[in-house]
Structure formats: C-alpha cells, structure tokens
Amino acid sequence: MGSSHVPSDLLGAIAERRGLIAFVVGAGCSLESPTNLLLSAEYSRSAFELLKRNGVLEDGDCNPADLSDVASAVFAKEHSQRSLVQALPRENYQHARPNAGHLLAVAMMAEGAISCIATVNFDMALSNAITQLGAGGIATVGGPEDFGRFADKTIVYLHRNAYESDVDKWIGKPV
C-alpha cells in the first residue's frame, strides 16, 4: 500500500477552521457499511425491469443503467416520474445510516473546517450523520426553493433528496 500525501495548503486550510473547504460528493459515498446502498446504475436497472414488467417501458426506450435517461423515458410516456420514484427504495434512502465518511465529513463541518458539502445523492446519510453526531448549526438545502437557508455550514442536495414530496422534481431529467 503506497503512502498518501495531503498537500500542505489543504492541511493548513483544515487546521485554520475557517470553512475554506467544500466537498462535492456522490457516486460511491454510500456504498460503505453501514450505509450499504448500491450505485444508481443498479437501482436504475432494477427500476427499469419493474417498469418494463408493468408495461411502462420497453427495451430500447432508454439506457437502463442511466437513471436520468430512465426518468426522461418515463416522463415522455407518462408526463410524470411517479412510477419511477415508486420503483426506487425511497425509504432506504431516507433512513440511510451514515458510514465513516459521512460522519467524518459532518464532524469536519461541525468543527468549521468545511463550509459546504454538496451531494448528488438522494440518500439522507449526511443529514442523518448530523443527528447521530448531535452537530448543530448545519443548514440543509434540499432544492432551489431552499437556497435562502444557505448558511456558513450547509449540506446541499443538488438533485434534491428522498424527502422531496413532488415526484416530478425528484430525479433530474433533461428538459
């Protein structure tokens, strides 16, 4: 195993605790135990197969491994993404247990080393880490309508999250 080198300017920014660092996280962050979620391609394929069995989609309508492509195909046929959102394990996303990476990122934010964590994931593991750690003063932005809540310490769900009630906003699709 090779040694890793953290650049001195990054170490300095962490040590200063002035929120000079932002993380952008996504694919793979929630694979580790105890979160244990799959990559979106796996959920997309599973949802595609269910939607195919239910007569919503057919082979050739989209790339089954691309969740945005599946969302676009469902929307084109039904003018809604509801059937796709219902085919995803939404409750698993809502109750996702944070892993060591989530906990460390939120702890660094609570200590002032990180100002923003932007995630492309739907799961709530980062927000659940706030609760698990008892970290206060961290805002959550779940969508564009929440940008007024942006604060010195903020988690931003770039594609919304599992608590989004409007199913047609839940998954990004090309316009």
Name the predicted role of every residue range:
Residues 1-175:
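Conserved catalytic-core helix/loop/strand module for nucleotide-ribose chemistry
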